[in-house]
Amino acid sequence: MAMNKSVGLFSSASLAVDYVDSLLPENPLQEPFKNAWVYMLDNYTKFQIATWGSLIVHETIYFLFSLPGFLFQFIPFMRKYKIQKDKPETFEGQWKCLKGILFNHFFIQLPLICGTYYFTEFFNIPYDWERMPRWYFTLARCLGCAVIEDTWHYFLHRLLHHKRIYKYIHKVHHEFQAPFGIEAEYAHPLETLILGTGFFIGIVLLCDHVILLWAWVTMRLLETIDVHSGYDIPLNPLNYIPFYTGARHHDFHHMNFIGNYASTFTWWDRIFGTDVQYHAYTEKMKKLGKKSE
């Protein structure tokens, strides 16, 4: 009986979604996107799409999203939005970071990306246009992946800060006390594997099409580059997401080394009280700001 009720509710929800979808205006980008997708399927193998497609998506999105933060250091107007104004970026630091990033991308992440095709084949994940999910279902699954990754990240990140292992692995990521966008994936290879596992758990549980893999890569990179940007930009649309950590939240983690362990959402830090120092610091800064006015 309970099973029948659940099926009935699911069917009703699906019908409601279909009805709302029928009322929405036609997406002008859908036809060009469909043509490009079909062309890709006709001209490339699944292995090429899964491997080189995933690599291109990752590298393009990573450096494209990192570019604004890199340019901000040369724009005097943007200085007022930099969170740690007393710690400007240096050429030496950024060059060291870039070399570390490229090593991780091509010697750690690329071998993992090469397994994407075998992953999709093992789990029967489709590539075809006919089974392409609607954008809002993909978005919902990406949010599900974000919740799963954030949970994994909080507890494993906190473990990496344990005094007995911190200096061996996670200390590499904290070489930069004032983070900047491209530094988001600068880490010890073991950390890349440990924290990166959280990215794949959601994919294993929720992936219904290869497009979700690329959409989730895009969302995760956008988020991690934003929180590592070192800038608190007004009207940043990401800051309107409920419980979103944001640049100030994670910047404090780099400045203080303790607390604010979550990657995307604030609830785990709030539940376990690991944001107490952060809130005390923000209150102190507010009082100092009022006194200086």
Curated annotation (Swiss-Prot):
GO terms for cellular component: endoplasmic reticulum membrane. It is a multi-pass membrane protein. A motif (Histidine box-3) lies at residues 249-255. Residues 144-274 form the Fatty acid hydroxylase domain. It is an enzyme of class 1 (oxidoreductase). A motif (Histidine box-1) lies at residues 157-161. Coiled coil: none annotated. The chain crosses the membrane at residues 55-75, 100-120, 199-219. The keyword Lipid metabolism applies. Its EC number is 1.14.18.9. It is found in: Endoplasmic reticulum membrane. The keyword Transmembrane applies. The histidine box domains may contain the active site and/or be involved in metal ion binding. This is Methylsterol monooxygenase 1. It comes from Rattus norvegicus (Rat). The gene is Msmo1.
